[in-house]
């Protein structure tokens, strides 16, 4: 854990809709809006096996070029890279993060986010476009239907679990 006395910890309130999608209320004066590459401990990356970025576009100062530096370093050290995303905060596009996406092993956008980023509506076209950026496994969350997965071996839908009440 790194403590920066100049940053307030971000507080997020997560809201879950009936279809299981989540949205968050975030303090724009917290660390999520101020984190940058100087806060990344590259020595610790060398010790890990998986780098999981909770959300591309969540920290505006971790832009595409910055993520590309972090992800390429992680790949050089044999890490598996996973990344989720949120809707772009500053109008970013797929092309803004293209350099970083080529390093991602598992990418977890939801359908709405993926449609916005690709300009497509058809699940297959959305997943194919994301896959074309070099992502190894596109795992698109499709609400109550489950996940649409696209990789070099093809496509499959993993159905959502039924009868589970989230607490």
Roles of regions detected by a PLM:
Residues 2-3, 14-106, 111-157, 163-164:
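Ribokinase/PfkB-type carbohydrate-kinase core domain
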Residues 5-7:
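A short catalytic or substrate-binding loop motif that flags glycine-/basic-rich loops and adjacent residues
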Residues 9-12:
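Short alpha-helix plus adjacent loop in nuclease-associated cores
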Residues 167:
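A phosphate-binding catalytic loop at a beta-strand-loop-alpha-helix junction
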């Amino acid at each position: 854990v790194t403590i920066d006395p100049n940053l307030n910890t971000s507080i997020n309130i997560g809201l879950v809709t009936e279809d299981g999608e989540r949205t968050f209320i975030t303090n724009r004066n917290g660390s999520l809006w101020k984190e940058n590459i100087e806060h990344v401990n590259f020595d610790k990356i060398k010790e890990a096996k998986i780098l999981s970025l909770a959300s591309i576009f969540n920290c505006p100062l971790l832009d595409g070029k910055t993520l590309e530096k972090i992800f390429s370093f992680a790949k050089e050290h044999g890490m598996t890279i996973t990344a989720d995303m949120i809707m772009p905060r500053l109008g970013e596009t797929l092309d803004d993060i293209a350099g970083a996406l080529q390093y991602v092993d598992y990418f977890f956008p939801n359908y709405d986010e993926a449609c916005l980023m690709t300009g497509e509506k058809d699940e297959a076209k959305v997943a194919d476009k994301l896959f074309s950026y070099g992502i190894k496994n596109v795992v698109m969350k499709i609400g109550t239907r489950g996940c649409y997965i696209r990789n070099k071996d093809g496509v499959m839908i993993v159905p959502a679990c039924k009868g589970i009440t989230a607490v």
